[in-house]
Swiss-Prot record:
Primary location class: membrane
Function: Low affinity sodium-dicarboxylate cotransporter that accepts a range of tricarboxylic acid-cycle intermediates with 4-5 carbon atoms. There is no interaction with monocarboxylates.
GO CC terms: plasma membrane
BP-aspect Gene Ontology terms: citrate transport; succinate transport; transmembrane transport
Membrane-crossing segments per the record: 17-37, 59-79, 87-107, 130-150, 224-244, 271-291, 317-337, 353-373, 401-421, 455-475, 482-502, 527-547
Tissue occurrence: Nad-1 and nad-2 are coexpressed in the intestinal tract from early larvae to adults, expression is from the pharynx through to the anus. Expression level is significantly greater in the anterior half of the intestine than in the posterior half.
Record family assignment: Belongs to the SLC13A/DASS transporter (TC 2.A.47) family. NADC subfamily.
Protein name as annotated: Sodium-dependent low-affinity dicarboxylate transporter 1
Topology in the lipid bilayer: Multi-pass membrane protein
Coiled coil: none
Species annotation: Caenorhabditis elegans
């Protein structure tokens, strides 16, 4: 027994090394298909398997694993080094950078805290209403800033609210004991004592909050905590910039079908996804209410006053906050009106396909660095007249921008490019074509279930990067619009509710100490099942009208390859003179 424990501890200590070298050896038989007609596909499958193993078991940092294609693709003859490098930073990455930098500007001026407290002090202190308020605020914020940042903001506020709810509940119990102890002839003194209890509230909290919460209070705290991470995951799916997996879809569409007018843009995605996200949030609230809040302590005016007090303590609207609101609103207008579909957009003023949503995002980023944080003044001392920094500064970006996620996105795009270039996606699609014995809707449901299952054990960005090209090829082989499978796979990649390790929001909430893995798994399973059904209904009843999915589009039947510089020169009869190969 001791020997077994020693081996187990040794495996845990050297787990990282075992996974790194074990994956290389276990999948090495794939490299034996050297002279085979599918040799290139086998080599690419080896790269996918190794990267997938490293990502799932986190043998290396996720961003470092993303650089593997830069090494293996050129060595295996799948893609040239410069082609792989170009795949790491497509247009979608600049869209991601722009969206996150705007979010950093919002966080820097603390505008997000003002919005959160305003909504919470409005909904009141009833636990069910508090949950609805937190879910609404979290879902809305996660549409525009990262799910992780949203959760990190909301959890401390929620912990404060839970403390107020619990202390208020205990104070009311103490009032009830006082009323039971005194006889009816002393009603007035009891009433005076009740009025004085709020002044003793701090003393009660010091004595009582040191002890463990009652089961009823623990149950309430669990439900409120879960509502934050679940609504952050759901809300991010509502906009095309809300979560990384949505951006992966945009990048994969550009990679797999270059130059195609797929109809996927900021406005069309919002129209497609927002109704489903709204329904998912309502369903999630119902599930968590039934599981955790049916017998929760009632709220009172004290907690409402506490939220009102915190909101009143905020300073007046600063110039920075108003300027960030302006930039944020301008960005939304530029995104929505570039290709509104119903009327000509401002993008038509320029050459076709020359302007994208990334153009708008980077314009706003430069504007954030240009506009001052404080309104210039000609009065006051020389120190007061000193020029202020911009709404966003590079030190903040360097310190808080998630560069690793950018590299992870790029690695996904490079991996997808290799899968396409080697023909592996075509082969996998041909194998999956045997699913054509099923109805297309059944295949769609199978894709959703696979995506939901995998996204709970590794990054949703990874799942989207690997799985989207496969289902796209499957749809092409069945001669149906690839968006029929790509859209539900992308949406369902956000439904990571089962485990703390599934997403950073889950991990942040779990680290609060209120939850056990079993709590998250049971409630997450109920939420997942409902969200899968709602996602399926959204595809069947709504998505077809938004994206016209009923016909097999020409851009999917004959995807044009990306135009190389040399190809462009030949087409335009241009000869480069006096140039040398770099």
């Amino acid at each position: 027994m001791a020997r077994k424990r020693g081996i187990s501890s040794l495996l845990l200590i050297y787990k990282q090394s075992f996974v790194i070298w074990g994956a290389l050896l276990i999948f090495s038989p794939l490299l034996m298909f050297v002279g085979d007609s599918h040799g290139l596909q086998a080599k690419c499958l080896y790269c996918v398997a190794v990267m997938g193993s490293y990502w799932v078991f986190e043998a290396l940092p996720l961003a470092i694993t993303a650089f593997i294609p830069m090494i293996l693709f050129p060595l295996f003859g799948i893609m040239r080094s410069e082609e792989v490098a170009r795949a790491y930073l497509p247009d979608t990455c600049f869209l991601f950078m722009g969206g996150l930098m705007v979010a950093l500007a919002v966080e820097k001026c603390e505008l997000h805290a003002r919005v959160a407290l305003f909504v919470l002090k409005t909904v009141g202190s009833e636990p069910a209403r508090v949950m609805a308020g937190f879910m609404g605020v979290t879902g809305f914020l996660s549409m525009w800033i990262s799910n992780t940042a949203t959760t990190a903001l909301m959890v401390p506020i929620l912990q404060s609210v839970i403390t107020e709810l619990v202390s208020n509940h205990r104070m009311e119990d103490l009032v009830a004991l006082c009323e039971a102890h005194h006889n009816s002839s002393r009603k007035h003194s009891v009433g005076m004592r009740r009025l004085s209890l709020p002044n003793e509230n701090n003393e009660i909290k010091r004595e009582e909050m040191d002890t463990a919460m009652s089961p009823r209070e623990q149950k309430m705290a669990k439900g409120l905590m879960l509502s934050v991470c679940f609504s952050a995951n759901i809300g991010g799916a509502a906009t095309i910039t809300g979560t990384a997996s949505n951006l992966v879809l945009v990048g994969q569409l550009n990679e797999l079908f270059p130059g195609a007018d797929t109809g996927v843009n900021f406005l069309s995605w919002l129209i497609f996804a927002f109704p489903m996200v709204f329904c998912c949030l309502i369903y999630c609230w119902c599930v968590l209410y039934l599981l955790y809040l049916r017998d929760a302590p009632k709220g009172s005016i004290i907690v409402t006053r506490k939220l009102q007090q915190k909101y009143n303590e905020l300073h007046a609207f600063s110039f920075a906050e108003m300027a960030v609101i302006f930039c944020f609103a301008l960005l939304l207008v530029l995104w929505i009106l570039r290709e509104p579909q119903v009327v000509p957009g401002w993008g038509e003023m320029f050459k076709d396909e020359f302007v994208s949503d990334a153009t708008s995002a980077m314009f706003i980023v430069i504007l954030l660095f240009t506009l001052p944080e404080k309104l210039p003044s000609s009065r006051g001392s020389s120190e007061q007249r000193k020029a202020s920094s911009g709404l966003l500064d590079w030190a903040t970006v360097q310190d808080r921008f998630p560069w690793s996620v950018l590299f992870l996105l790029g690695g996904g795009f490079a991996l997808a490019a290799g899968v396409k270039e080697s023909g592996l996606s075509h082969d996998i699609g041909a194998i999956m074509r045997y699913l054509d014995v099923f109805n297309h809707n059944i295949i769609m449901l199978i894709c959703i279930i696979i995506s939901v299952t995998l996204t709970n054990v590794c990054s949703n960005t990874v799942i989207a990067s690997i799985f989207i090209p496969i289902v796209a090829e499957l749809a092409r082989s069945l001669e149906i619009d690839p968006l029929n499978f790509m859209l539900p796979v992308t949406i369902s990649a956000s439904f990571a509710f089962l485990l703390p390790v599934a997403t950073p929001p889950n991990a942040i909430v779990f680290s609060s100490g209120y939850l056990k893995v079993f709590d998250m798994f049971v409630s997450g399973l109920c939420v997942t099942l409902g969200c899968v059904v709602l996602s399926m209904l959204n595809m069947l009843l709504w998505a077809g009208f938004v994206f016209n999915l009923h016909l097999f589009p020409q851009w999917a039947a004959n995807p044009s390859p990306p135009l190389d510089v040399q190809d462009w020169a030949v087409e335009n009869n241009i000869t480069f003179v006096g140039t040398s190969k770099l």
